[in-house]
């Protein structure tokens, strides 16, 4: 095809988009801003895997889908247990 490039374009996520803790904070803020119960919505998503539990506001749904649910759960448990040790 004339005018097309045969160069490969690479997409790189920003590092903060792969940090489960930061993603959870952004998703929490988006849910809260929209008037949802962030805890209920995040738990619903973690249990079901259904992304419609998460608002698309502020790109929250796209952000949370970049992280595996088990990684999000691991971050939540780690954060909770670390706070117990303080």
UniProtKB/Swiss-Prot annotation:
<comment type="similarity">
    <text>Belongs to the UPF0297 family.</text>
</comment>
<protein>
    <recommendedName>
        <fullName>UPF0297 protein STH1998</fullName>
    </recommendedName>
</protein>
<dbReference type="InterPro" id="IPR009309">
    <property type="entry name" value="IreB"/>
</dbReference>
<dbReference type="Pfam" id="PF06135">
    <property type="entry name" value="IreB"/>
</dbReference>
């Amino acid at each position: 095809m004339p005018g097309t490039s045969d160069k490969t374009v690479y997409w790189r996520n920003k590092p903060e988009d792969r940090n489960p803790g930061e993603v959870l904070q952004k998703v929490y803020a988006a849910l809260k801003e929209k008037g949802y119960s962030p805890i209920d919505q995040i738990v619903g998503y973690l249990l079901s895997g259904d992304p419609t539990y998460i608002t698309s506001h502020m790109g929250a749904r796209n952000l949370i889908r970049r992280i595996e649910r088990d990684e999000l759960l691991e971050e939540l448990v780690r954060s909770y247990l670390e706070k117990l040790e303080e």
